[in-house]
């Protein structure tokens, strides 16, 4: 749970809002395979503002760099990308141009814990979207930011990152995932034992 203070600069009114973390759904949730329709409500609005704040908070809690609403069981065409200190919300996101040059790099996904796959993506993309204030944005993204945008846009279109990989790559990634999960469980058990000794 997180507390957010909002100050209306025209009236000077301060409002307090308690935000609850969103529930994150795993890879087999059917909503991850559904294309999300365009968001039609006028912006800004309190419902979208609250959803974006909760997406940002949840992404930060899971140490992610991107999170889409449908990963949390919410059928809204919005995602957030960014780091701990800077996040942007993308409502009705679109790619309007992309590089011919392709880059292959590792990607993970909060809905696929401890799983990583090499995925081909354009090195840059020109994108359009609305932020939670209703401002229309047209920007060029490159590198990791472009990769995150495209990964989350795939979620909006019902595409999972494993859909970009072949069966052998997925099998190898599953094996690495299993080993990593076992290591994390072992580390967690050892940490609990150490905590109980104090």
Per-region residue spans from a language model:
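Positively charged
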Residues: 1-198
């Amino acid at each position: 749970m997180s507390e957010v203070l909002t100050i209306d600069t025209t009236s000077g009114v301060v409002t307090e809002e308690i935000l609850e973390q969103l529930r994150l759904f795993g890879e087999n949730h059917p909503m991850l395979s559904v294309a999300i329709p365009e968001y039609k409500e006028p912006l800004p609005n309190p419902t979208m503002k609250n959803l974006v704040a909760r997406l940002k908070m949840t992404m930060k809690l899971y140490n992610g760099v991107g999170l889409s609403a449908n990963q949390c069981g919410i059928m809204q065409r919005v995602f957030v990308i960014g780091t701990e200190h800077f996040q942007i919300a993308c409502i009705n996101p679109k790619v309007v141009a992309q590089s011919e040059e392709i880059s292959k790099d590792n990607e993970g996904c909060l809905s696929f814990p401890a799983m990583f796959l090499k995925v081909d993506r354009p090195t840059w993309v020109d994108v359009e979207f609305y932020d939670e204030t209703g401002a229309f944005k047209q920007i060029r993204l490159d590198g990791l930011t472009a990769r995150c945008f495209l990964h989350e846009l795939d979620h909006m279109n019902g595409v999972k990152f494993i859909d970009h990989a072949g069966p052998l790559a997925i099998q190898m990634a599953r094996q690495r995932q299993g080993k990593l999960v076992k290591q994390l469980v072992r580390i967690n058990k050892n940490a609990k034992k150490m905590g109980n000794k104090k």
